[in-house]
């Protein structure tokens, strides 16, 4: 047992009234198939004393993405895996799921220790244990090291922010569901930001993330934030502070570049070039949004802290680029500038300039026809990489061809 009795005694008093997801989730039976959630042992030194579970869909190809799922307090790996909706899309789009499990030996309510110094520091504790699980999946399942993502609920959402901050070289993107910003509370105190929020400037929030791995020079992860407007367990102010933290980390404004209305009274705010998303679910309490049903964008099983509203797993999977897109945050294609080669002077042949090829169609049709591609739920024009809007049949764009496989918006 890693925790001293005195620390456990102090933590028990603090967290007793601060349950981040205070009811165990009952696992439902898995579909009749060979693939099952399986416990993995000996995945590393495991300094955080966590259990590892993994799910590999049938016929998982080499180089598949991987998503880490982090449950809430008093929940477990099997229950969150079975009910959160992620298994459906892992089967459909072929990516692995890594599901860490906390224990009461570490924390009385089986909460991930998103506020304990040794567990939120790069290279130690629970953060390192989770990173070792990712390494194990890469080495043993052949997952793609460049397409690793994380999503967590409540205390797991707080730990999701920890992983994004401490291991930006491991995670390409992540989502924080009913969670909290990285280092929003002093060590061993859950109540500071949980119940009232902590108001810091975006720069102050961003500095906390950058200090988690100061030697990192590569890109920082993209982040999606989910929160119910009626959440009284982790107050909604934390969603705004998360937005401030990660927009600053990504170097974009705290003013949204686009907003949209989604089902279940969900308001979506998009920041930068889809760097950060914030989903505010009107009237929803504390939990992971699910939407049980057979529809393409439905998922999950409703229950305690799994709230029947909208399928967050679907939207996160699309945001991560797991639905067949090119991956998050596509890098624009840059064509080198070529100096023309001088040739003997000749009388030019004059020919009429042809009218440009312009096509108006749904964004889905543009992608299907090869005039555009999709990534993170959005369509982008081939060649120019201009964002056209949501990738679906309802958004319509006009594209003009300006060169071989090069299209721009407008005509």
Q: Model-flagged regions — what are they?
A:
Residues 82-86, 137-140, 145-218:
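Primarily recognizes the serine-hydrolase "nucleophile elbow" in alpha/beta-hydrolase
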Residues 71, 152-154, 228:
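Conserved alpha/beta-hydrolase "nucleophile elbow" surrounding the catalytic nucleophile
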Residues 2-17, 22-66, 79, 84, ...:
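A domain-start/cap signature at the N-terminus of enzymes
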Residues 118-141, 162:
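Alpha/beta-hydrolase active-site loop
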Residues 60-108, 184:
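Short substrate-entry loop that stabilizes the transition state in hydrolases
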Residues 329, 341-411:
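Tryptophan-rich substrate-binding surfaces of secreted polymer-degrading and adhesive proteins
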Residues 225-227, 231:
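Short beta-strand/loop motif that positions the catalytic acidic residue
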């Amino acid at each position: 047992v890693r925790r001293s009795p005195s620390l456990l005694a102090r933590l028990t008093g603090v967290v007793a009234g601060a349950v981040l997801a205070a009811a165990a989730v009952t696992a439902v039976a898995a579909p009749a198939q060979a693939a099952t959630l399986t416990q993995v042992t000996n995945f590393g030194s495991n300094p955080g004393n966590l259990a590892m579970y993994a799910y590999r869909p049938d016929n998982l190809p080499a180089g598949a993405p991987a998503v880490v799922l982090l449950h809430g307090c008093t929940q477990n790996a099997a229950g969150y895996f079975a009910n959160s909706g992620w298994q459906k899309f892992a089967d459909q789009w072929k990516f692995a799921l890594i599901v860490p499990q906390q224990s009461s030996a570490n924390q009385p309510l089986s909460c991930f220790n998103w506020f304990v110094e040794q567990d939120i520091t790069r290279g130690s504790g629970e953060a390192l244990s989770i990173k070792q699980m990712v390494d194990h999946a890469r080495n043993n399942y052949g997952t793609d090291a460049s397409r690793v993502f994380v999503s967590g609920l409540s205390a797991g959402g707080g730990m999701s922010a920890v992983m994004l901050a401490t291991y930006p070289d491991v995670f390409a993107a992540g989502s924080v569901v009913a969670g909290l910003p990285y280092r929003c509370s002093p060590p061993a105190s859950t109540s500071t930001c949980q119940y009232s929020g902590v108001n810091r400037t975006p720069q102050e929030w961003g500095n906390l993330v950058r200090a988690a791995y100061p030697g990192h020079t590569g890109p920082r992860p993209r982040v999606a934030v989910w929160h119910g407007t009626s959440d009284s367990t982790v107050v909604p102010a934390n969603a705004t502070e998360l937005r401030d933290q990660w927009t600053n980390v990504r170097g974009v404004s705290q003013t949204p570049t686009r907003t949209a209305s989604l089902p279940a009274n969900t308001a979506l705010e998009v920041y930068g070039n889809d760097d950060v998303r914030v989903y505010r679910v009107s009237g929803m309490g504390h939990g992971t949004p699910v939407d049980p049903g057979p529809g393409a964008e439905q998922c999950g099983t409703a229950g305690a802290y799994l709230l029947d509203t909208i399928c967050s797993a679907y939207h996160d999977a699309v945001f991560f680029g797991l639905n067949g897109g090119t991956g998050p945050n596509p890098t624009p294609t840059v064509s080198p500038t070529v100096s023309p080669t001088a040739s003997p002077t000749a009388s030019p042949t004059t020919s009429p300039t042809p009218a440009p090829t312009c096509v108006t169609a749904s964004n889905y049709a543009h992608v299907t026809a090869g005039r555009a591609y999709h990534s993170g739920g959005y369509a982008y024009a081939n060649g120019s990489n201009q964002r056209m809007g949501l990738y679906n049949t309802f958004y319509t764009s006009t594209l003009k061809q300006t060169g071989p496989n090069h299209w721009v918006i407008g005509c």
